[in-house]
């Protein structure tokens, strides 16, 4: 294998000089992975533009070996952190793409363990992938997401084709025939949630009782024996969602709390109907003083599910007992 596989590759160019390119790389072998990934990285390196890679360690080694000395010009991130949780990846990508690079295109290759967290996590990854097409539509960036068809479920591969406008293989791009516009995908793939357990602890609130809800949530968090930072994150997320319910959900609601051996849950229900197809997925404007609650919660929680139900709008926050959100880069 040559020390620098970029040297022999010609740059076929990028369609358009601005805007997002979002493609899925579906592969079944190490060679198919390299044949699809290397052209992406080489284009960025040849142009002297930023290249970021967040893939599992064994894939990163393949890329480093293939790139040779040029791998030093690639920013390699630990995928176990960068791609651990959909909301955290969304926040990290937002921070990375928003940096001022004087119009240079940004190149990103990412691969998470898309199926590893169970069906609910896999579905959330797919919703996040779909929303990227809206959230970063104006970003001058080429984002390629790799999927190992040899180990992933057929449903996950089908979702990849539905949430990425393009497919790439061997350095060649094609339109994904299965692609669904984000609003259509969101409508067809809402979160599926079981009802809270009958023994969930519940507290009602309105604008006059926000302080008591926060104190009640603090007491509940203390009983969970969380670390100080972890408990603080939980309380921030609960506060944001309860405040959001008061301001936008009819002025009142009910919060339910329960736990499992792996996770803690808070579900906030308030009157109303969900009207936004991408609640909390779109990055707020830098100067936006309000409307950040759901976005912040997605950066803190391991999962945030929002749905319209018979009781109104339900926002369910899931916190891992062990995982904590990484500090912003």
Predicted regions mapped to residue ranges:
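Short glycine/serine/threonine/alanine-rich loop segments
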Residues: 49, 141, 226, 251, ...
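Short glycine-rich, polar/acidic loop-and-turn segments at beta strand-coil junctions
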Residues: 55-58, 238-240, 259, 270
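Amphipathic alpha-helical segments that form the core helices of the histone-fold
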Residues: 42, 238-243
């Amino acid at each position: 294998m040559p020390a620098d596989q970029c040297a022999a590759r010609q740059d076929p160019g990028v369609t358009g000089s601005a805007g997002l390119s979002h493609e899925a790389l579906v592969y079944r072998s190490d060679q198919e992975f390299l044949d699809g990934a290397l052209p992406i990285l080489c284009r960025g390196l040849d142009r002297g533009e930023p290249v970021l890679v967040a893939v599992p360690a064994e894939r990163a080694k393949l890329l480093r070996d293939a790139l040779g000395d040029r791998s030093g010009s690639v920013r390699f991130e630990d995928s176990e952190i960068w791609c651990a949780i959909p909301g955290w990846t969304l926040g990290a990508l937002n921070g990375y793409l928003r940096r001022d690079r004087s119009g240079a295109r940004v190149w990103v290759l990412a691969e998470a363990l898309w199926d590893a967290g169970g069906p609910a996590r896999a579905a959330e990854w797919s919703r996040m992938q779909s929303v990227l097409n809206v959230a970063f539509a104006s970003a001058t960036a080429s984002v390629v997401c790799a999927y190992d068809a040899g180990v992933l479920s057929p449903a996950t591969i089908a979702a990849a084709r539905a949430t990425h406008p393009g497919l790439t293989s061997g350095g060649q791009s094609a339109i994904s025939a299965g692609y669904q516009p984000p609003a259509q995908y969101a409508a067809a793939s809402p979160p599926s949630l079981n009802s809270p357990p009958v023994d969930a602890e519940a507290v009602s609130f309105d604008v006059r009782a926000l302080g008591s809800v926060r104190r009640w949530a603090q007491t509940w968090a203390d009983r969970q024996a969380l670390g100080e930072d972890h408990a603080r994150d939980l309380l921030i997320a609960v506060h944001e969602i309860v405040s959001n319910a008061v301001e936008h959900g009819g002025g009142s609601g009910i919060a339910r709390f329960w736990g499992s051996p792996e996770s803690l849950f808070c579900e906030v229900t308030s009157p109303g109907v969900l009207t936004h197809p991408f609640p909390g997925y779109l990055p707020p404007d830098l100067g936006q003083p309000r409307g950040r609650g759901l976005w912040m919660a997605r950066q803190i929680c391991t999962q945030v599910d929002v749905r319209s139900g018979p009781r109104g709008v339900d926002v369910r926050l899931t916190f891992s007992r062990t995982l904590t959100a990484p500090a912003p880069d």
